[in-house]
Amino acid sequence: MADKTKILIIGGTGYIGKFIVEASAKSEHPTFALARESTISDPVKGKIIQGFKNSGVTILTGDLYDHESLVKAIKQVDVVISTVGQLQLADQVKIIAAIKEAGNVKRFFPSDFGTDVDRCHAVEPAKSSFEIKSQIRRAIEAEGIPYTFVSANYFAGYSLPTLVQPEVTAPPRDKVIILGDGNAKAVFNEENDIGTYTIKAVDDARTLNKILYIKPPKNIYSFNELVALWEKKIGKTLEKIYVPEEQVLKQIQESPFPINIVMAINHSAFVKGDLTNFKIEPSFGVEASELYPDVKYTTVEEYLDQFV
Protein backbone atom coordinates (compact mmCIF):
# COMPACT_ATOMS: atom_id res chain seq x y z
CA MET A 1 0.00 0.00 0.00
CA ALA A 2 2.96 2.30 0.59
CA ASP A 3 3.48 2.82 -3.13
CA LYS A 4 -0.18 3.55 -3.89
CA THR A 5 -0.90 7.10 -5.01
CA LYS A 6 -1.84 9.34 -2.09
CA ILE A 7 -5.01 11.32 -2.72
CA LEU A 8 -6.23 14.54 -1.06
CA ILE A 9 -9.88 15.55 -1.45
CA ILE A 10 -10.78 19.19 -0.79
CA GLY A 11 -14.53 19.63 -0.23
CA GLY A 12 -15.05 16.00 0.74
CA THR A 13 -18.12 16.58 2.92
CA GLY A 14 -20.05 18.06 -0.01
CA TYR A 15 -22.58 16.19 -2.14
CA ILE A 16 -20.31 14.50 -4.71
CA GLY A 17 -17.23 14.79 -2.48
CA LYS A 18 -18.49 12.10 -0.10
CA PHE A 19 -18.72 9.54 -2.92
CA ILE A 20 -15.22 10.36 -4.16
CA VAL A 21 -13.71 10.07 -0.66
CA GLU A 22 -15.46 6.70 -0.21
CA ALA A 23 -14.28 5.42 -3.61
CA SER A 24 -10.71 6.47 -2.83
CA ALA A 25 -10.72 4.78 0.58
CA LYS A 26 -12.31 1.63 -0.89
CA SER A 27 -9.64 1.39 -3.58
CA GLU A 28 -6.99 1.35 -0.81
CA HIS A 29 -5.34 4.58 -1.88
CA PRO A 30 -3.99 6.42 1.17
CA THR A 31 -6.82 8.96 1.34
CA PHE A 32 -6.71 12.39 2.96
CA ALA A 33 -9.57 14.86 3.40
CA LEU A 34 -9.02 18.53 4.15
CA ALA A 35 -11.48 19.89 6.72
CA ARG A 36 -11.86 23.12 8.66
CA GLU A 37 -12.05 23.03 12.47
CA SER A 38 -15.65 24.29 12.17
CA THR A 39 -16.54 21.39 9.84
CA ILE A 40 -15.09 18.81 12.23
CA SER A 41 -17.12 20.22 15.15
CA ASP A 42 -20.31 20.72 13.11
CA PRO A 43 -23.06 18.30 14.27
CA VAL A 44 -23.98 17.21 10.72
CA LYS A 45 -20.65 17.46 8.87
CA GLY A 46 -18.84 16.09 11.92
CA LYS A 47 -20.71 12.79 11.46
CA ILE A 48 -19.53 12.63 7.84
CA ILE A 49 -15.94 13.27 9.00
CA GLN A 50 -16.28 10.48 11.58
CA GLY A 51 -17.51 8.17 8.82
CA PHE A 52 -14.42 9.05 6.78
CA LYS A 53 -12.17 8.23 9.74
CA ASN A 54 -13.93 4.88 10.17
CA SER A 55 -13.08 4.12 6.52
CA GLY A 56 -9.41 4.81 7.19
CA VAL A 57 -9.30 8.35 5.81
CA THR A 58 -6.75 10.75 7.32
CA ILE A 59 -8.33 14.11 8.21
CA LEU A 60 -6.04 17.10 7.70
CA THR A 61 -7.09 20.33 9.38
CA GLY A 62 -6.89 23.19 6.96
CA ASP A 63 -8.77 25.75 4.96
CA LEU A 64 -9.07 26.83 1.35
CA TYR A 65 -8.42 30.38 2.59
CA ASP A 66 -5.30 29.51 4.63
CA HIS A 67 -2.45 29.18 2.13
CA GLU A 68 0.03 27.62 4.57
CA SER A 69 -2.39 24.87 5.63
CA LEU A 70 -3.18 24.13 1.97
CA VAL A 71 0.48 23.84 0.98
CA LYS A 72 1.20 21.67 4.03
CA ALA A 73 -1.66 19.29 3.16
CA ILE A 74 -0.78 19.14 -0.54
CA LYS A 75 2.88 18.33 0.18
CA GLN A 76 1.74 15.06 1.80
CA VAL A 77 0.01 13.69 -1.31
CA ASP A 78 0.42 12.96 -5.03
CA VAL A 79 -3.02 13.84 -6.36
CA VAL A 80 -5.46 16.61 -5.40
CA ILE A 81 -9.19 16.31 -6.12
CA SER A 82 -11.36 19.37 -5.53
CA THR A 83 -15.08 18.86 -4.99
CA VAL A 84 -15.84 22.32 -3.61
CA GLY A 85 -19.35 23.69 -4.09
CA GLN A 86 -20.79 26.38 -6.30
CA LEU A 87 -19.77 29.30 -4.09
CA GLN A 88 -16.10 28.25 -3.86
CA LEU A 89 -15.53 27.45 -7.54
CA ALA A 90 -13.65 30.70 -8.28
CA ASP A 91 -11.54 30.29 -5.12
CA GLN A 92 -9.93 27.19 -6.59
CA VAL A 93 -7.23 29.61 -7.81
CA LYS A 94 -6.02 29.30 -4.20
CA ILE A 95 -5.60 25.53 -4.68
CA ILE A 96 -3.76 26.16 -7.95
CA ALA A 97 -1.37 28.57 -6.19
CA ALA A 98 -0.75 26.06 -3.38
CA ILE A 99 -0.13 23.23 -5.88
CA LYS A 100 2.39 25.43 -7.70
CA GLU A 101 4.20 26.20 -4.46
CA ALA A 102 4.15 22.60 -3.20
CA GLY A 103 5.60 21.42 -6.50
CA ASN A 104 4.93 17.71 -5.97
CA VAL A 105 1.44 17.15 -7.41
CA LYS A 106 1.19 14.58 -10.20
CA ARG A 107 -2.44 15.35 -11.04
CA PHE A 108 -5.16 17.88 -10.16
CA PHE A 109 -8.88 17.24 -10.62
CA PRO A 110 -10.76 20.55 -10.22
CA SER A 111 -14.40 20.68 -9.14
CA ASP A 112 -16.02 20.02 -12.51
CA PHE A 113 -18.13 16.82 -12.46
CA GLY A 114 -21.05 18.11 -14.51
CA THR A 115 -21.55 19.17 -18.09
CA ASP A 116 -18.46 19.82 -20.22
CA VAL A 117 -18.30 23.56 -19.65
CA ASP A 118 -16.20 24.14 -22.79
CA ARG A 119 -18.87 22.59 -25.00
CA CYS A 120 -22.19 23.95 -23.82
CA HIS A 121 -24.67 26.70 -24.64
CA ALA A 122 -26.15 27.48 -21.24
CA VAL A 123 -28.14 30.60 -20.41
CA GLU A 124 -27.89 32.56 -17.17
CA PRO A 125 -27.61 31.86 -14.29
CA ALA A 126 -25.94 28.53 -15.23
CA LYS A 127 -23.79 30.31 -17.83
CA SER A 128 -21.78 32.28 -15.22
CA SER A 129 -21.21 29.20 -13.09
CA PHE A 130 -19.98 27.23 -16.13
CA GLU A 131 -17.74 30.15 -17.13
CA ILE A 132 -16.04 30.05 -13.72
CA LYS A 133 -15.32 26.33 -14.19
CA SER A 134 -13.97 27.13 -17.64
CA GLN A 135 -11.69 29.88 -16.24
CA ILE A 136 -10.34 27.42 -13.65
CA ARG A 137 -9.56 24.95 -16.45
CA ARG A 138 -7.64 27.66 -18.34
CA ALA A 139 -5.73 28.66 -15.19
CA ILE A 140 -4.65 25.03 -14.60
CA GLU A 141 -3.49 24.71 -18.21
CA ALA A 142 -1.65 28.04 -18.08
CA GLU A 143 0.27 26.96 -14.96
CA GLY A 144 1.23 23.66 -16.58
CA ILE A 145 -0.34 21.61 -13.78
CA PRO A 146 -1.10 18.00 -14.88
CA TYR A 147 -4.88 17.58 -14.80
CA THR A 148 -7.96 15.50 -15.49
CA PHE A 149 -11.31 17.24 -15.92
CA VAL A 150 -14.22 14.91 -15.09
CA SER A 151 -17.45 15.47 -16.99
CA ALA A 152 -19.94 13.34 -15.06
CA ASN A 153 -23.13 14.82 -16.55
CA TYR A 154 -26.29 14.42 -14.43
CA PHE A 155 -26.00 13.04 -10.91
CA ALA A 156 -28.67 10.31 -10.82
CA GLY A 157 -29.64 11.23 -7.25
CA TYR A 158 -30.47 14.80 -8.29
CA SER A 159 -32.48 13.99 -11.38
CA LEU A 160 -33.92 10.48 -11.58
CA PRO A 161 -35.92 10.22 -8.30
CA THR A 162 -38.25 12.93 -9.70
CA LEU A 163 -37.74 12.18 -13.41
CA VAL A 164 -36.37 15.74 -13.70
CA GLN A 165 -39.71 17.24 -12.59
CA PRO A 166 -39.59 20.64 -10.87
CA GLU A 167 -40.34 21.02 -7.16
CA VAL A 168 -41.56 17.48 -6.47
CA THR A 169 -40.13 14.70 -4.33
CA ALA A 170 -41.30 11.59 -6.21
CA PRO A 171 -41.49 10.48 -9.84
CA PRO A 172 -44.70 11.32 -11.73
CA ARG A 173 -47.67 8.94 -11.73
CA ASP A 174 -50.19 11.01 -13.76
CA LYS A 175 -48.63 13.74 -15.86
CA VAL A 176 -45.09 14.64 -16.81
CA ILE A 177 -43.51 17.92 -17.93
CA ILE A 178 -41.06 17.52 -20.82
CA LEU A 179 -38.69 20.31 -21.84
CA GLY A 180 -38.43 21.15 -25.55
CA ASP A 181 -39.41 18.35 -27.93
CA GLY A 182 -37.99 15.68 -25.60
CA ASN A 183 -35.57 14.31 -28.20
CA ALA A 184 -32.22 15.73 -27.01
CA LYS A 185 -30.19 13.06 -25.23
CA ALA A 186 -28.81 13.47 -21.72
CA VAL A 187 -26.62 11.26 -19.51
CA PHE A 188 -27.35 10.09 -15.94
CA ASN A 189 -24.76 8.54 -13.63
CA GLU A 190 -25.08 7.01 -10.19
CA GLU A 191 -22.86 8.86 -7.72
CA ASN A 192 -20.89 5.82 -6.52
CA ASP A 193 -19.98 5.11 -10.14
CA ILE A 194 -18.78 8.70 -10.59
CA GLY A 195 -16.53 8.16 -7.56
CA THR A 196 -15.23 4.83 -8.88
CA TYR A 197 -14.43 6.14 -12.37
CA THR A 198 -12.76 9.28 -10.96
CA ILE A 199 -10.43 7.29 -8.70
CA LYS A 200 -9.61 4.83 -11.51
CA ALA A 201 -8.44 7.79 -13.62
CA VAL A 202 -5.95 8.98 -10.99
CA ASP A 203 -3.04 6.79 -12.11
CA ASP A 204 -4.10 6.32 -15.71
CA ALA A 205 -1.80 7.88 -18.34
CA ARG A 206 -4.73 7.81 -20.79
CA THR A 207 -6.61 10.41 -18.72
CA LEU A 208 -3.63 12.77 -18.22
CA ASN A 209 -4.42 16.30 -19.47
CA LYS A 210 -7.74 15.04 -20.84
CA ILE A 211 -11.44 15.34 -20.12
CA LEU A 212 -12.82 12.09 -18.68
CA TYR A 213 -16.41 11.81 -19.90
CA ILE A 214 -18.65 9.46 -17.95
CA LYS A 215 -21.09 8.42 -20.68
CA PRO A 216 -21.89 4.72 -20.30
CA PRO A 217 -24.07 3.65 -23.26
CA LYS A 218 -26.92 2.34 -21.08
CA ASN A 219 -27.24 5.71 -19.30
CA ILE A 220 -27.87 7.93 -22.34
CA TYR A 221 -31.57 8.83 -22.63
CA SER A 222 -33.70 11.52 -24.19
CA PHE A 223 -36.52 12.91 -22.04
CA ASN A 224 -39.02 10.99 -24.20
CA GLU A 225 -37.07 7.74 -23.78
CA LEU A 226 -36.82 8.27 -20.02
CA VAL A 227 -40.58 8.80 -19.76
CA ALA A 228 -41.26 5.72 -21.94
CA LEU A 229 -39.00 3.61 -19.70
CA TRP A 230 -40.81 4.86 -16.58
CA GLU A 231 -44.24 4.22 -18.15
CA LYS A 232 -43.17 0.66 -18.93
CA LYS A 233 -42.04 0.15 -15.32
CA ILE A 234 -45.26 1.43 -13.75
CA GLY A 235 -47.52 -0.03 -16.46
CA LYS A 236 -49.26 3.28 -17.10
CA THR A 237 -49.29 5.96 -19.79
CA LEU A 238 -48.67 9.46 -18.47
CA GLU A 239 -50.14 12.70 -19.77
CA LYS A 240 -47.26 14.57 -21.43
CA ILE A 241 -46.96 18.35 -21.26
CA TYR A 242 -44.32 19.69 -23.65
CA VAL A 243 -42.83 23.07 -22.75
CA PRO A 244 -41.44 24.96 -25.77
CA GLU A 245 -38.04 26.63 -25.46
CA GLU A 246 -39.41 30.22 -25.29
CA GLN A 247 -41.51 29.23 -22.29
CA VAL A 248 -38.59 27.44 -20.61
CA LEU A 249 -36.46 30.60 -21.00
CA LYS A 250 -39.27 32.76 -19.58
CA GLN A 251 -39.61 30.44 -16.56
CA ILE A 252 -35.84 30.60 -15.93
CA GLN A 253 -35.99 34.41 -15.90
CA GLU A 254 -38.98 34.50 -13.56
CA SER A 255 -37.83 31.85 -11.08
CA PRO A 256 -35.92 32.56 -7.85
CA PHE A 257 -32.44 31.18 -7.07
CA PRO A 258 -31.61 28.25 -6.92
CA ILE A 259 -34.59 27.01 -9.00
CA ASN A 260 -33.48 29.19 -11.92
CA ILE A 261 -29.99 27.65 -12.04
CA VAL A 262 -31.42 24.10 -12.02
CA MET A 263 -33.81 25.06 -14.81
CA ALA A 264 -30.99 26.65 -16.82
CA ILE A 265 -28.93 23.45 -16.50
CA ASN A 266 -31.97 21.40 -17.60
CA HIS A 267 -32.46 23.76 -20.56
CA SER A 268 -28.82 23.27 -21.59
CA ALA A 269 -29.13 19.47 -21.36
CA PHE A 270 -32.66 18.77 -22.58
CA VAL A 271 -33.34 21.61 -25.01
CA LYS A 272 -29.86 22.33 -26.36
CA GLY A 273 -28.61 18.74 -26.01
CA ASP A 274 -25.32 19.98 -24.57
CA LEU A 275 -24.40 16.68 -22.92
CA THR A 276 -24.34 14.72 -26.17
CA ASN A 277 -24.20 17.09 -29.15
CA PHE A 278 -20.46 16.66 -29.77
CA LYS A 279 -18.13 13.78 -30.53
CA ILE A 280 -15.43 12.88 -28.00
CA GLU A 281 -12.17 13.29 -29.93
CA PRO A 282 -8.99 11.56 -28.66
CA SER A 283 -7.24 14.95 -28.80
CA PHE A 284 -9.24 16.22 -25.81
CA GLY A 285 -11.20 13.41 -24.20
CA VAL A 286 -11.76 9.78 -23.26
CA GLU A 287 -14.87 7.89 -22.14
CA ALA A 288 -14.89 6.15 -18.75
CA SER A 289 -16.90 3.00 -19.51
CA GLU A 290 -14.65 2.32 -22.53
CA LEU A 291 -11.47 2.78 -20.47
CA TYR A 292 -12.77 0.71 -17.53
CA PRO A 293 -15.07 -2.02 -18.90
CA ASP A 294 -14.54 -3.94 -15.63
CA VAL A 295 -16.66 -1.41 -13.70
CA LYS A 296 -20.20 -2.70 -13.40
CA TYR A 297 -22.05 0.59 -13.45
CA THR A 298 -25.64 1.11 -12.34
CA THR A 299 -27.86 1.59 -15.38
CA VAL A 300 -30.72 4.10 -15.50
CA GLU A 301 -33.11 1.17 -15.86
CA GLU A 302 -31.78 -0.48 -12.67
CA TYR A 303 -31.75 2.84 -10.82
CA LEU A 304 -35.42 3.54 -11.52
CA ASP A 305 -36.51 0.16 -10.10
CA GLN A 306 -36.28 1.49 -6.53
CA PHE A 307 -39.05 4.04 -7.22
CA VAL A 308 -41.60 1.75 -8.85
UniProtKB/Swiss-Prot annotation:
Main subcellular location of this protein, as a coarse class: cytoplasm
Gene Ontology terms, MF aspect: oxidoreductase activity
Top-level taxon of the source organism: Eukaryota
Keyword presence, NADP: yes
Sites where the protein binds NADP(+): 11-17, 36, 45, 137
Record keywords: Allergen, Cytoplasm, NADP, Oxidoreductase
Active-site positions on this chain: 133
GO cellular component, one term: cytoplasm
Database matches in InterPro entries: NAD(P)-bd_dom_sf, NmrA-like, NmrA-type/Isoflavone_red_sf, PCBER-like
Pfam families: NmrA
Cellular localisation: Cytoplasm
Further facts: The catalytic tetrad is probably composed of Lys-133, Tyr-158, Ser-159 and Asn-153.
Subunit structure of this chain's protein: Homodimer.
Family membership noted in the UniProt record: Belongs to the NmrA-type oxidoreductase family. Isoflavone reductase subfamily.
Protein name: Isoflavone reductase-like protein
Organism: Olea europaea (Common olive)
